[in-house]
Amino acid sequence: LDKQPTSRGCFLCGRQNDIGLKMNWLNDYEARQVWSEVIIPEGFNGYPGVVHGGIVAALLDETAGRALMLDGDHDGLFITTKLEVKYHLPTPTGEPLRVVGWVIKRGSRFARVGAEIRLPDGRVTAICEAAVARPPRKFFETCDWDSEKQYWKIVE
């Protein structure tokens, strides 16, 4: 299994984000999926012991989008244009979670991707489907991607 790149400031993967989760994603080429394991601490909860729904959505969104990097295209970035999340069970804080993402359909400019969060026993707490698109050049100017790109790398 190969690791995917991480960044410096991203809430989920940023290595220099003091309040971030510092997640890593792995490519499972045989299953055509990407996955990450994470324990979400209290402080990212909505109700006590339950991960906030917005954090759940962020986990799903990032993991679904990362499925597009399975073929090694780490520079062909996409942005989410629509995200539909179905919450099946409370996602617990303080317990190991596995977030899995996959590609549903991919084109050159648009794609549909999905992801789910699994408990150690395999039950799914939440699932998403997202529409993503290649961002226009203006997006990269707004986020100053050219100067940030140097921090987008695989960390061992």
Describe each PLM feature range.
Residues 26-28, 102-106:
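Short beta-strand micro-motifs enriched in acidic
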Residues 31-35, 82, 96-98, 112, ...:
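Intrinsic-disorder/low-complexity, polar/charged segments enriched in Ser/Thr/Lys/Arg/Asp/Glu/Gln
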Residues 63-98, 103:
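Hydrophobic beta-strand-centered segment that forms part of the acyl-chain substrate-binding groove
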Residues 1-43, 148, 152-156:
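Non-catalytic linker/capping segments at the edges of enzyme domains
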Residues 35-59:
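A conserved, well-ordered hydrophobic junction motif at loop->secondary-structure transitions
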Residues 1-3, 92-93, 104-156:
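HotDog/MaoC-like acyl-thioester-processing domains
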Residues 46-49, 78, 137-139:
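A short, polar/proline- and glycine-enriched secondary-structure boundary/capping micro-motif
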Residues 37-39, 84-86, 100-102, 116, ...:
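Residue-level recognition of well-ordered beta-strand positions that form the cores
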